[in-house]
Amino acid sequence: MQILLANPRGFCAGVDRAISIVENALAIYGAPIYVRHEVVHNRYVVDSLRKRGAIFIEQISEVPDGAILIFSAHGVSQAVRNEAKSRDLTVFDATCPLVTKVHMEVARASRRGEESILIGHAGHPEVEGTMGQYSNPEGGMFLVESPEDVWTLNVKNEGKLSFMTQTTLSVDDTSDVIDALRKRFPKIVGPRKDDICYATTNRQEAVRALAEQADVVLVVGSKNSSNSNRLAELAQRMGRTAFLIDDAADIQEAWVKDAACVGVTAGASAPDILVQNVIARLREFGGGEAVTLEGREENIVFEVPKELRVDVREVE
């Protein structure tokens, strides 16, 4: 059985930054550090940080006065941000800069009183945070998930209308929704630069190449990870058997026993140690040496806040 690895896969710059913010805050200030929502959607990462003293909460009211609070990589609404400001808290923002870009687009439309449409998945924390940047009662903010949703919209002024997208969507599905928006609202304005982030696009491109060669595709990522789910869906659309797994223990031998080639990738919030564990598990089932496919090189780095720019080793 051949083992192929998608390239790129795993951590993106936004996830690296968010985890570093929590780790550095723990090193500098000590436990406990409060984090609103899971800092990234990965069980292994969250459990590791929890063991070191991070406390994950959903409501600002759960945070005691004087505590350190970190916003997750998915971003928060203005209402949440304002509630935190009203408290005696030290706040660090781990929102991915590419999510912040979308927040700024929505806030700009809100200031102008222009209606906006967000393409995204209802209930996802990134969507809740992005929708929460709009506050102008003269305009309006709408959420759509599919082309069908577009035709149910009732906007006030089709001449002043813009759209944005969640950063972790399927590139193909989003293209279909955008096509529907442009048909329904010919004057609609989109972002100057695509809102779907580089890491989402690159990992979908990589899993497409992987699925062309593999019989079975394993996607390492947690069930609540949007970008990981999209990778599994894409492999399935290409006619491959695909499984979304948290770790190597999830793999059943029956999944791969008849496969000549198994492909492995990882969502943007899944650490490489989980991929290495998957490779080890597949080798127990008769797999050979893992081979990494060619792919796009990623060199993007997002800096942590200056207050947290410290060599963690200096404070240990």
UniProtKB/Swiss-Prot annotation:
Binding site for [4Fe-4S] cluster: C12, C96, C197
Keywords in alphabetical order: 4Fe-4S, Iron, Iron-sulfur, Isoprene biosynthesis, Metal-binding, Oxidoreductase
Keyword Iron-sulfur in annotation: yes
Pfam hit, one: LYTB
Residues bound to (2E)-4-hydroxy-3-methylbut-2-enyl diphosphate: H41, H74, H124, T167, S225, S226, N227, S269
Record CDD domains: lytB_ispH
Names of the cofactor(s): [4Fe-4S] cluster
Chain residues that bind dimethylallyl diphosphate: H41, H74, H124, S225, S226, N227, S269
Main function: Catalyzes the conversion of 1-hydroxy-2-methyl-2-(E)-butenyl 4-diphosphate (HMBPP) into a mixture of isopentenyl diphosphate (IPP) and dimethylallyl diphosphate (DMAPP). Acts in the terminal step of the DOXP/MEP pathway for isoprenoid precursor biosynthesis.
Similarity section: Belongs to the IspH family.
Protein name: 4-hydroxy-3-methylbut-2-enyl diphosphate reductase
Organism (species): Salmonella paratyphi A (strain AKU_12601)
Recorded name of the encoding gene: ispH
